[in-house]
């Protein structure tokens, strides 16, 4: 149960999010969890898949004999295998294929490139994408931080996303929601910031 980290909670592991922790704006960006390790080439991947399937079969036989039915995770393995070896998925995650002009339009920062990646994922059929943009907890120096960094990053990235979706004809069937979770006091504190409501 990972309520604070955006996990599936009571829904169960099958509804857990696929989290990309790598920064898409970093040089040589690749999503580790969908990248084929360089050491696994040729038939090695298929051999490993068959070995795992055989071991799983033995485990199910053992569980049946011990009258201890375990929850099968074969479907998860299969889903992961298809994702890693899918050319469509690999292409969607490869934002280096985007023209530099497009990448700059979104903003050459983590948030902007995550929005670009989100657009690419929706184009290949991913029904739900969440992009996180932290750094809004301004207890001090609120005006300068927002004016110089936080707001331009948000504005540039969101404007590029909306424009891109409209140009590609997908805006009409895409719901874009931009929200924050902070409830702030309207009063500016002595450090030129805003604090949380005290309950």
Predicted regions and their residues:
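Ligand-binding pockets and gating/stacking loops
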Residues: 1-199
């Amino acid at each position: 149960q990972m309520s604070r980290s955006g996990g599936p909670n009571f829904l169960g592991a099958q509804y857990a999010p696929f989290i990309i922790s790598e920064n898409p704006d970093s040089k040589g960006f690749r999503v580790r969890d969908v990248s084929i390790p360089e050491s696994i080439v040729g038939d090695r991947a298929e051999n490993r898949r068959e070995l795992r399937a055989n071991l799983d079969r033995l485990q199910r036989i053992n569980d049946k004999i011990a009258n201890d039915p375990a929850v099968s995770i074969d479907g998860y393995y299969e889903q992961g295998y298809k994702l890693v070896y899918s050319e469509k998925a690999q292409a969607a995650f490869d934002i280096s294929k985007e023209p530099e002009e497009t990448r700059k339009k979104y903003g050459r920062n983590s948030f902007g490139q995550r929005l670009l990646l989100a657009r690419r994922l929706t184009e290949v059929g991913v029904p739900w994408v969440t992009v996180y943009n932290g750094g809004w907890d301004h207890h001090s120096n609120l005006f300068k931080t927002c004016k110089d960094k936080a707001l331009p990053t948000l504005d540039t990235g969101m404007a590029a996303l909306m424009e891109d979706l409209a140009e590609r004809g997908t805006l009409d069937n895409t719901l874009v929601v931009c929200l924050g979770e902070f409830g702030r006091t309207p009063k500016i504190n002595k450090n030129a910031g805003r604090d949380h409501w005290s309950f």
